[in-house]
Regions:
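Conserved "HGTGT" condensation-loop signature of ketosynthase/thiolase-family condensing enzymes
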Residues: 1-78, 102
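Acyl-thioester C-C bond-transforming condensing/cleaving domain
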Residues: 2-3, 27, 68-74, 87-155
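Short glycine-rich or small-residue beta-strand-to-loop segments that form or flank ligand, phosphate
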Residues: 78-85
Length: 155
């Protein structure tokens, strides 16, 4: 029996257009650019704006870009795992929303919620599905819309 080995065959990212700068944060909370940079190294953050736009929007854009980049039809995808701490809603899962919007009609899809380690768990889980022969083409999405849970007034 031939051993199946999982491999990462493509990587794609997506960030929203809106940029929240440290200068803007100065108007929301008692802080300044130098204080933030010296303690965190953060200069700016990308924020997904718009009514009803959730984490799935980030995943949809990234998956569309990935499918185009590696030249795979969405219907060839067997499984989508979305690692997120900020799902759009309890159900349907963010992964199911992504699968639907990108046209991955043959894919199983589920969310894996394990905070910061979620993406690592999702990669590990995906590799096991591939190596056991359960699925061939698996997409792992790591996405969070932290702006939906961050209190910008809390220093």
């Amino acid at each position: 029996m031939k051993k199946i080995t999982a491999a990462i065959t493509g990587v794609q990212g997506y960030v929203p257009n809106y940029i929240l700068t440290n200068k803007e944060l100065e108007t929301m909370v008692e802080t300044n650019d130098e204080w933030i940079r010296s303690r965190t190294g953060i200069k700016e953050r990308r924020i997904l704006k718009g009514e009803g736009k959730g984490t799935s929007v980030l995943g949809i854009e990234a998956v569309r870009g990935l499918l185009k980049k590696i030249n795979i039809d969405a219907q060839e995808v067997d499984l989508i795992i979305c690692a997120t701490a900020t799902p759009d809603m309890i159900f349907p899962s963010t992964a199911c929303i992504i699968a639907d919007k990108v046209g991955a009609t043959n894919a199983f899809a589920y969310d894996l919620m394990a905070a910061c380690s979620g993406f690592l768990y999702a990669i590990s889980t995906a590799s096991k599905f591939i190596e056991t022969g359960t699925y061939k083409k698996v997409i792992v999405v790591g996405a969070d819309k932290m702006s939906s849970i961050v209190d910008y007034q809390d220093r």
